[in-house]
Amino acid sequence: MLIQAVTIFPEMFDSITRYGVTGRANRQGIWQFEAVNPRKFADNRLGYIDDRPFGGGPGMIMMAPPLHAAIEHAKAQSSQAAKVIYLSPQGKPLTHPKAAELAELPHLILLCGRYEGIDERLLQTSVDEEISIGDFVVSGGELPAMMLMDAVLRLVPGVLGDMQSAEQDSFSSGILDCPHYTKPLEFQGMAVPEVLRSGNHGLIAEWRLEQSLRRTLERRPDLLEKRVLIPKESRLLETIRQEQREIQS
């Protein structure tokens, strides 16, 4: 997989290309990265790529021509079709299913905005999709781009040492992950649940499912409204709800 970022701050991406599981996978050649600086495509000696907005208003707007040239340069680096994504609070929310969809693609170009935004004409002519990481605003698109990259790359075969890690993550199955424990057996008076030390894999699997459902019901009940429950899940969920009703009464 080739991922390119159109950014005026290429150095920011060192954190994902050099460190952790994504950095290791990059060194192993499982995925490749290139930062494309639109300043190199500016039509002025100083590399300005922004100007004042027509109609007035605060801040500066990134100009379409240098960004368009940077995107076209990025596309030319691969013979495979690229999907151009603009990281924007106005985009559709990034979800696990969307990350899984993007993980299947061979070439992504991530457009990282700065200042007050990007000329609308560039978005209409050169961007395939706008994606948001949440209902809040940050100073630029680089951090959202790296969050998207991390979510996507975890689902690319070979990036994680064990793909089961990705399969057990929160949201991968549509519900939140269960609690996890390791040594020591006791910490500040709290012991590891006995079932996890029993060696009974069937009981452990059922406990983890029950805990995932319990946590999802408490923290993200909206996820359960979207999920088609299998009979075992329905049974466990009804038991949890009955417990809650008894506590409240």
From Swiss-Prot:
What top-level class of enzyme does the UniProt entry assign? transferase
Its EC number is: 2.1.1.228
> Where in or outside the cell?
Cytoplasm
Q: Does the keyword S-adenosyl-L-methionine apply?
A: yes
**Gene Ontology MF, one:** tRNA (guanine(37)-N1)-methyltransferase activity
Its cellular-component GO annotations read: cytosol
Going by the UniProt record, its keywords in alphabetical order are:
Cytoplasm, Methyltransferase, S-adenosyl-L-methionine, Transferase, tRNA processing
Superkingdom of origin organism: Bacteria
Q: Which CDD domains match?
A: TrmD-like
UniProt GO BP: tRNA N1-guanine methylation
Where along the chain is S-adenosyl-L-methionine bound? G113, I133, G134, D135, F136, V137, V138
Catalytic reaction equation(s): guanosine(37) in tRNA + S-adenosyl-L-methionine = N(1)-methylguanosine(37) in tRNA + S-adenosyl-L-homocysteine + H(+)
Q: What does this protein do?
A: Specifically methylates guanosine-37 in various tRNAs.
Similarity comment: family membership: Belongs to the RNA methyltransferase TrmD family.
Assembly notes: Homodimer.
Q: What is this protein called?
A: tRNA (guanine-N(1)-)-methyltransferase
